[in-house]
Amino acid sequence: MYDLVIIGSGPAGLSAALGAARNGLDYTVLERSSIADTIYRFPTAKTLFSTGNELELMPGTFPRGFKPTREGLLSHYLKTARDERLRILTGVNVRRIMAEGDSFRVQSVECEFRSRAVLVATGGFGKQRMLSVPGESDDRVSYNFQEPYRFALKQVLVVGGGNSAAEAALDLSDLAARVTLSVRRAKLDLPPSAPGGAPIKPWVLEPLWGAIREDKIKLIPSSRVLEITPSSAILALDTGSNGAAEEEIECDHILALIGADPDTTLLSEAGAVIANDGRPVYDPETYETTVPGLFVAGHVTRERHIKKAIHVGRRVIETSVMPMLERCSV
């Protein structure tokens, strides 16, 4: 029986694994895809918003003073996992967590693991948000953007009002024949906290406005997709006092970069209470859910930043899991 099973090998899971290893725990990490898969799914050559010291798994192991790229951060995480000999099993799709007395059974498609404690660090992107409109299909719509070259000389509709959509529109603006950006908000130049404001970083918003002014990107605010046809998308427009209107946008492809939500199925089926915001109920000090011995960390919680995910992953081991295991062994 393991002391701890960690589900997920993103920044929080890797940080927790380091903490478990350094505290002498018998642990394993179960990952259904690849190590740091969330980072892997970032756009190619993307520069992150945080600096190296905010993203490193161990202090002093990542160059300081600059913001790393996707590739640089992936290399750092993979190198750390290799050098520290972290016990990570990839390709293990966990289907169920069952509490049995003072231990857990963690079941995957192929096998079963027994553990005294479980830490779920499966990230915040388990359930992709969909447009949910007629005509939506994989042929017409993509929900993840990695590089612009497949869309060269094509007409692309980007849907979304956040950083991902804004950056994708910018990346496409020099290659695509036409880029249209559809956002639900009325204005992009308001702060995120303001009604109708967009959560776009200032250093992304400035070049976005430049591309809009140069007619490289057509912005359609106060809009949402109503229907998708084989060659276009029908947008509903909120025209204020004039009521609603519709506009047809010709497009070869649609990028719906409208976010995702955590998949809390494992937690809820294990008996953990899920709050109205779709995230688990947990003690903000220990990160223990309503099921004793079942912990959470990373973006599946309400901590949305990588820096915080790394800190919490390590902290859960030292201040929550270790004391619990020591109490149980007395």
Task: Please provide the spans of the model-predicted regions.
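A conserved FAD-binding loop/helix module that cradles the flavin
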Residues: 196, 297-330
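Residue-level detector of alpha-helix initiation sites
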Residues: 10-11, 34, 163, 301
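Short hydrophobic core segments
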Residues: 5-7, 112-125, 157-159, 250-259
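Beta1/beta-strand and adjacent pyrophosphate-binding region of the FAD-binding site
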Residues: 1-12, 154-162
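Beta1-alpha1 glycine-rich phosphate/pyrophosphate-binding loop at the start
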Residues: 11-86, 169-200, 274-277
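A Rossmann-like FAD-binding core segment of flavoenzymes
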Residues: 75, 83-106, 113, 176-277, ...
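FAD-site-proximal beta/loop scaffold in flavoenzymes
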Residues: 136-150, 260-305
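Rossmann-like NAD(P)H-binding beta-loop-alpha module
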Residues: 154-177
